[in-house]
Every structure is written in structure tokens, then in C-alpha cells.
Design a protein with these regions (language model features):
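Short acidic-hydrophobic, aromatic-tinged amphipathic segments that line or gate anion-handling sites
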Residues: 526-542
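Intrinsically disordered, low-complexity cytosolic terminal tails
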Residues: 554-556
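Short secondary-structure boundary/hinge segments and terminal tails
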Residues: 289, 330, 516, 535-536
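Transmembrane helical cores of multi-pass ion-transport proteins
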Residues: 1-425, 490
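The feature marks cytosolic C-terminal regulatory regions of anion transporters and related permeases
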Residues: 359-526, 544-552
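Active-site-adjacent beta-strand anchor residues
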Residues: 74, 507-508, 533
């Protein structure tokens, strides 16, 4: 149960006043970083700006309080933008809330079932493919607001989106582009000046002031979304229906997988920064509770945010108190300063997300991976990338996982091999080789199996053949780590053929897992326990004695 115990309860022992001050200061700084990102990501996801803050406040609190990392900062992230936009377009806000709650439940179940370590089995090529796909989709999604295009709602499909931009390209607002360019310049250059204050906050303050005081014709959050609510999020139970749950189970599962991958990756990165070890299963439960309550209080899916978590560590945060302080600070901003957020130019938020999208993708690494990775990995990478861009994230991950599994099984099947031993007197055996070989009679055939024997490789067993002189077949299995039911069926077929030909089967060096499967299948009873020997020397001695005994009986 200690694995499920929240990290907060562990780190409070010996907690000092000095660390409390550091955590509070770090939490305030991280809240300032999270503010523009939460608003921008919510808008990019197709929901209202305040829902981004609701998510950072509610989900962030539960992730910090119940999670398995000391310094994790939870909230909305760019990874969810694509899937959230698709859900909102198809099912509306209530559908998104249902999917978020379902994803939270799935994450809690994963944590309770100790699935934290299983996330590592998601191939790197899949996570890379959909991450770069998300980056492209997020980047393209900001073109309307960055250029100030006068058009209706942006289509959710990638090709339709590009078509809509092309059709409305003549409506570009030069003033909007200029303000967006100013924001971009600040975002790019500010980190070189100082990392104490986030460039996104400076860009928002500067461009908002320019637009407001110069009364420039630029769309702002207020002009697009109206007056923003400064009320604290209220509890809302969405209407569940069997049909809706059935339709949303796949998107919810995708959200859960994404949240699990990103949060545990963030936890691993922060572990390296502070020299700690997170609890993966407790972290999944914290993420699950965060998403459940985020949905119930009007938020969107959330996970551990790597950039915000790293900022927390760099500013002295070392316990979940920093994450909780970040939530409290955002709550105060929501109540006191939210009306001012309506003045923020939409092009500035688009610029913030353009930089986020650019930072998500290191294209040099992407093309290097395409050039150097094995062909099967490249297929998975490219397929996941293009499916994310041209279809959606749900399809991309489903196809990516299935494709990766099939290609992995193909690789494993190709490693499985059955090799027949040569006899010392065969013409192609050199004298030097013959000296090292054991001289066995031609009535004994030896086959060595290598690699895992599973359904894709079970046919290799069919290559075990005999001739009229064969009395005994010795099967050496020291290089077989595992077998499955399909392989057992093939072994039973081999045993049946051998019995018809009055050939005895002897097995040498059967490893633990194959032996366990054979016992469970009663295969050992079928063959005879005495025909299973611990090594090849004893197996050959046993086979030669059998042949010799049968020869003596025939002579009599």
C-alpha cells in the first residue's frame, strides 16, 4: 500500500519553515507561468478561456495532493488540444466533461492495479509520432488568430482547415499580424534576458497595453468570448447515457494513456532534477482524481506539465505544497484579475501557442530517427505522425499500437529458428569441425530451437523432420525463453507424428516458463517425464542408450 500513498504524506516529515517559504514562492511563480498557458490551451481546445484556469486550479490541486511526485505541477497541456477539439466538435462541452471523468476513472483503475510500470511498454516511436503530429496540428490551428483572418469557426479536419485558411487569406489583418509579431519577438528573445519571469507573461502585458491604449482593431478574448466570469468553478454532474459512454470510451482511453505517459515522463524528468524517486501508481491515481474533479467542476483533461514542473524545481519547489500554492494563486487571480484577461489580444495567445508547438518538436531529431531507425520503427513513427495530423489522435494511437505490436511479433518470429545438427561424417564437415563434434548415430537426430516460440513462430516446429532410419529425436531448448498455446499445439502435433513413426522424443534443457506451460498442458505426461533431461550431454547419452537397447532387443 505504500506505493499508493501520496508523496505529500511522506515529505511532510521534517518539513521546515525555510522550505515552506521556498515552496510558496515557487508556487506563485509557476502560477504566473501557468496563467497564459492555461487560457491559451483552453481556447485552442475549443472551450472557453476560464475552463483552462478551472483545470489548472482543480486538477492541479488533486494531482499535487494525491500524486506520487514531490514536485509535479498539473494542468492543461498541448498534448490534449487535438483530442479535446475533436470531442468538443462532435459531442459538445458535456461530452468532453463525460470523457474527462471517464479518463480519470481509467487512470485510477490503472493506478490501483499497479499499471504504472506498464506505460513504458508504449513504444518511443508512437509517442514521438503523435507528439510531432500534435505539434503540427497545434501550430496550424493558430493561423486564424495570428493572422486575424475574418472567418467563421475553424474546421477540425486538417485538410479542411488549410482550405478554409486559403479561402479567407485575403482577410488578413496587418495590425493583428504586427501585434502577433511583437509577441513572437518577445517570446523568443526574453529567455535570453532573464528566466525569472516567463516570456509569455511579458508578451501578454506589452501587447495588451499596446492594443488597449492605442485602441487598435485587434480581436481580444473579450471581443470573441464576451465578459469572462470571475466566479470560482461550481460542481456540475453531466448527463451520462449508455450510448454516450459507449461512444466516448475510446477517446477517454486515449486521454488516459496520454495523461499517464506525459505525467510519468514529467515525474521521471523531475526525479533526475531533485534526486528523488516518484511513485508511479500513486501518480496515476492522483492524475485520475485530478481529471475526475476537473470534469465535475467544468474543466478539461489535465496531466503533469513538464515545463511547469521543471520551472517549479528551478525556483526552489521541493514538495507538493508548491503545487498547491500554484492552485491557490491561480484561484486568487481568477477572482480578482480575470476581468482584465478579456483585454488580452487573441493573436498574442496564438503566438504563445506557436512557440509551444515549435518547442514540442525537434525536427532534426525527427528526421534523424527516420533515417537511422529500423524500417519497422520508421513505419510506426510515420504512420502515427500522419494519422495524428490527418485523422485524429485516437486513431493514431490505436493504429500505432497495433502496428507496433504486429511488427514486433514479426521481428520476434524471425528470430525463432530450428537448426538440425550435422553428423560428423557428412561430406561438408571439415576434419577440424568433425573433431569438435560428438559422433552420434544416424538413428538419432538433434534439433536446436532458438528464440521465443509463440503463434507467429509456431510453424518453425514443423521443420523438425525425420527419415526412415530415425529412432530418436532430441530437441534442445536452452535458447527458448518462452512458449505459448500455439507452440504447444505444434509440439503436440509433432509428438503425434513421432508416435505414428515409432520415434521417441527427448527434450534437453527446457527453461522455466516453457516447462511450466508443458506441465499445465500435461505435455510432460504425454511424452514421459524421464524424456526431459537437464542438458544436451545427458540427453544424448540417454538417446544413445535407448538406441543401443533397441538394437540389442532386435538382435535377440
Amino acid at each position: 500500500m505504500n506505493e499508493l500513498r501520496p508523496k505529500l504524506f511522506d515529505v511532510m516529515k521534517g518539513y521546515t519553515k525555510e522550505q515552506l517559504i521556498k515552496d510558496i514562492l515557487s508556487g506563485i511563480i509557476v502560477a504566473i507561468i501557468a496563467l497564459p498557458l492555461s487560457i491559451a490551451l483552453a481556447i485552442a481546445s475549443g472551450v472557453g478561456p476560464v475552463q483552462g484556469l478551472y483545470t489548472a486550479i482543480v486538477a492541479g490541486f488533486f494531482i499535487s495532493f494525491f500524486g506520487g511526485s514531490r514536485v509535479q505541477i498539473g494542468g492543461p497541456t498541448a498534448a490534449f488540444v487535438v483530442i479535446i477539439y475533436g470531442i468538443v466538435t462532435t459531442y459538445g462541452t458535456d461530452g468532453l466533461i463525460v470523457a474527462t471523468i471517464m479518463a480519470g476513472i481509467i487512470l485510477c483503475i490503472m493506478g490501483l492495479c499497479h499499471f504504472g510500470s506498464l506505460i513504458k511498454y508504449i513504444p518511443y516511436t508512437i509517442t514521438t509520432g503523435f507528439t510531432y503530429g500534435i505539434a503540427v496540428t497545434l501550430f496550424v490551428g493558430q493561423i486564424k488568430d495570428f493572422l486575424g483572418l475574418d472567418m467563421g469557426a475553424v474546421p477540425s479536419e486538417f485538410i479542411e482547415k488549410l482550405g478554409a485558411y486559403a479561402a479567407n487569406i485575403t482577410t488578413i489583418n496587418p495590425v493583428t499580424v504586427a501585434i502577433g509579431a511583437v509577441a513572437l519577438v518577445i517570446l523568443i528573445l526574453w529567455p535570453k534576458v532573464t528566466d525569472k519571469l516567463p516570456g509569455s507573461l511579458i508578451a501578454i502585458i506589452v501587447t495588451t497595453a499596446i492594443v488597449y491604449f492605442a485602441k487598435l482593431p485587434v480581436n481580444t478574448i473579450g471581443s470573441v468570448y464576451g465578459e469572462l466570469s470571475s466566479e470560482f468553478p461550481s460542481f456540475h454532474m453531466p448527463a451520462f447515457s449508455y450510448k454516450l459512454v459507449q461512444e466516448l470510451i475510446s477517446p477517454a482511453f486515449t486521454i488516459a494513456i496520454l495523461a499517464g505517459i506525459e505525467s510519468l515522463l514529467s515525474a521521471v524528468v523531475s526525479d533526475g532534477m531533485i534526486g528523488d524517486t516518484h511513485k508511479s501508481n500513486a501518480e496515476l491515481i492522483g492524475q485520475g482524481l485530478g481529471n475526475i474533479f476537473s470534469g465535475l467542476f467544468g474543466g478539461i483533461p489535465a496531466t503533469g506539465a513538464i515545463a511547469r514542473t521543471a520551472a517549479n524545481v528551478r525556483n526552489g519547489g521541493r514538495t507538493p505544497i508548491a503545487g498547491i500554492t500554484h492552485c491557490i494563486t491561480l484561484s486568487i487571480i481568477l477572482v480578482v484579475l480575470m476581468p482584465l484577461a478579456s483585454l488580452i489580444p487573441m493573436t498574442t495567445l496564438a503566438a504563445v501557442l506557436l512557440v509551444v508547438a515549435w518547442n514540442m518538436a525537434d525536427w532534426t531529431s525527427f528526421f534523424h530517427l527516420c533515417k537511422t531507425a529500423p524500417k519497422s520503427d520508421m513505419i510506426v513513427l510515420v504512420a502515427t505522425f500522419f494519422l495524428t495530423v490527418f485523422f485524429d489522435l485516437v486513431v493514431a494511437i490505436e493504429v500505432g499500437v497495433v502496428l507496433a505490436a504486429l511488427l514486433f511479433m514479426k521481428r520476434m518470429a524471425e528470430t525463432a529458428d530450428v537448426t538440425a545438427w550435422k553428423y560428423a561424417d557428412e561430406p561438408d564437415v571439415t576434419p577440424g569441425e568433425a573433431e569438435k563434434m560428438r559422433d552420434i548415430p544416424h538413428s538419432i537426430r538433434v534439433f536446436e530451437i532458438s528464440g521465443p516460440l509463440f503463434f507467429a513462430a509456431a510453424d518453425e516446429i514443423l521443420t523438425i523432420t525425420s527419415d526412415k532410419s530415425t529412432k530418436v529425436i532430441v530437441i534442445r531448448m536452452r535458447s527458448v525463453p518462452a512458449i505459448d498455446a500455439s507452440a504447444m499445439r505444434s509440439l503436440r502435433d509433432l509428438a503425434a507424428r513421432a508416435k505414428k513413426k515409432h520415434i521417441t522424443l527427448i527434450f534437453s534443457h527446457v527453461n522455466e516458463q516453457p516447462m511450466s506451460v508443458m506441465k499445465k498442458d500435461h505435455f510432460i505426461e504425454l511424452i514421459g517425464e524421464e524424456h526431459f533431461l537437464p542438458n544436451i550431454v545427458e540427453a544424448l547419452d540417454y538417446a544413445e542408450n535407448m538406441v543401443a537397447d533397441s538394437g540389442h532387443k532386435a538382435a535377440k
